[in-house]
Amino acid sequence: MNVFFSRLPCIGLLNRGQRNIRFLTNTTTPSNWNKVVSDAEKIVGYPTSFMSMRCLLSDELSNVAMHVRKLVGTKHPLLNTARGFVYESRNNLQMRGLVVLLMSKAAGPSQHTTSDLISQDMVSGIYPSQRNLAEITELIHTAFLVHRGIVNLKEWTNSDGTLKDMQFGNKMAVLSGDFLLANACTGLAQLNNTKAVELISSAIGDLVQGIYHEMPNHLEDNSLGDDITMVTWEEQMFLSHGALLAKSCQAAMELAKHDKEAQGLAYKYGRHLSLGHKLNSELQPFIKSSSTDPVTFSLNSAPVIFHRQTVGQEKWHHQLQQAKTIGRQIDYTKLRSTIKLEDGVTSTMDLCHYHSSKALESIQSFPSSEARSALENIASAVTKF
């Protein structure tokens, strides 16, 4: 058995952060989503709680935690991220790795299985190298999640904490993220598959490019992103939110020696699932049941882009001015009500359904199985608003 499996540290550091950077977390109906995940974990024989427990017991995480304690009392994002890992681990659904495992099991062994694969012991229909890939995928996402917690010190105020503490938090975010990413790269090399390494390496490059081009959540008047269309949105969201899952699914097929057609189908599933969930996430501020809840959303989110394209730039700028308070801050509750009067929200829902259906379509050629059904349930869950 490949011993790399037990050496990957901190795989469970996932999906808890700020600034709307969560992916495939519980944005759909809690009971429905949790059941989908629980059923899927039983199928792959790989509960996410086990991954989190091994992470929490690792020496590396213990050392990081000791330093992060120095940030207590500040508003540095790294502290909240770390708190989420420890105290909200039940919600840390490592969905990228879970999807990779389900895809591996659904596709099964290839007809072109080589001798080196035959010698590997499959567990629950999944090769050890594919399980390692699932953990590597989680580790890469975790590294970028930690990196996104870096604070712009130009916006620092005394209420955030001392400048020295915020600088220290930034250093910890950079070093911790780099450490996790280095471990992921080491794990990639141990897969001994150049095509898989190439795919995941390109996904890392996509993440860097996507995050670089990501717009801030709340934009000023001179940076409203009027030139951003849904085509641009999809390109940027795929780089920052979809490339890792899509290429990890494809790499899982490569590790089992599946042909290019199967690899392409796995890639399409990951791509459409990612975009579907991102749309679901951006819909949440507009479909919450309680209108009294405080609400914020990106002015470059899909519902806003659709709305802007419907009403035109001139009317959109007028609506923005009307939604501003005396202090020139945007009243997002008022702006949300304005946007909901048009078709932006329903258009986003339609696009979400489209990506869900395309994800479902991409796996229909796989043999009927519990794993395929679980993938279908996950794709359907992103349309539960």
Indicate residue ranges for each PLM-predicted region.
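C-terminal charged capping/lid subdomain of soluble metabolic enzymes
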Residues: 334-385
